[in-house]
């Protein structure tokens, strides 16, 4: 059986020691069951990541993932629309550390490819899906969508239909891009209304009749 109290104590010790080791660079420390989250300002991201990787005490030498979250319409978050989380792993301490920061819409943040080679493709994916520009990235191109794609599909305000229709023209033997043409205006459907207890009963009774 896992000793969660001991795991949490290890994370608390790491967080407090880290706060004391690099004073002024850490904005907030949050202790989760599975990981330790350190929130920093965008300008302090690289110094904190470098310290965690190169310090013999922490040895966060693996960048497992970079996660981007669109915080559009979340009133509590006013420091930037997008939350970017760098997921680090320390085999030495047997723990994961999340370094998080916020970036504004269409914002710019410096690449971490100089510290972690694995971030090259991860940053390309975030650029492709969210439109966040990684400054000094060695090869910042789209990675999942095609080169003529318009917009960033994982942004919450991106339309479901997209902006362009793509198809292959057999006669001209080439790929055609043209603006989306909808046959009817967009509609909002209330799919959830019939699944309440009372509403569902009335709905079924009407069907039986």
From Swiss-Prot:
The keyword Cytoplasm does not apply. It comes from the Eukaryota. Core subunit of the mitochondrial membrane respiratory chain NADH dehydrogenase (Complex I) that is believed to belong to the minimal assembly required for catalysis. Complex I functions in the transfer of electrons from NADH to the respiratory chain. The immediate electron acceptor for the enzyme is believed to be ubiquinone. PROSITE patterns: COMPLEX1_30K. Its main location: mitochondrion. This is NADH-ubiquinone oxidoreductase subunit 9. It catalyses: a ubiquinone + NADH + 5 H(+)(in) = a ubiquinol + NAD(+) + 4 H(+)(out). GO terms for cellular component: mitochondrial inner membrane. Its EC number is 7.1.1.2. Belongs to the complex I 30 kDa subunit family.
């Amino acid at each position: 059986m896992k000793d969660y109290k001991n795991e949490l104590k290890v994370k608390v010790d790491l967080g407090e020691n880290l706060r004391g080791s690099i004073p002024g660079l850490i904005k907030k420390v949050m202790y989760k069951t599975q990981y330790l989250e350190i929130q920093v300002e965008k300008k302090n991201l690289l110094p904190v990541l470098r310290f965690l990787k190169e310090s013999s005490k922490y040895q966060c030498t693996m960048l497992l993932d970079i996660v981007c979250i669109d915080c559009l319409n979340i009133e509590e978050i006013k420091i930037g629309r997008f939350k970017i989380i760098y997921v680090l792993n320390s085999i030495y301490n047997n723990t994961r550390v999340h370094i998080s920061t916020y970036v504004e819409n269409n914002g710019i943040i410096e690449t971490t490819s100089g510290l972690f080679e694995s971030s090259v493709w991860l940053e390309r994916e975030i650029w492709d899906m969210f439109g966040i520009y990684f400054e000094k990235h060695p090869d910042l191109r789209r990675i999942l969508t095609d080169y003529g794609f318009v917009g960033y599909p994982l942004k919450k305000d991106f339309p479901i239909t997209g902006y362009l229709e793509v198809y292959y023209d057999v006669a001209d033997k080439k790929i055609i891009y043209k603006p989306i043409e909808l046959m009817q205006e967009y509609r909002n459907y209330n799919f959830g209304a019939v699944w309440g207890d009372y509403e569902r009963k009335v709905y079924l009774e009407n069907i039986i009749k």
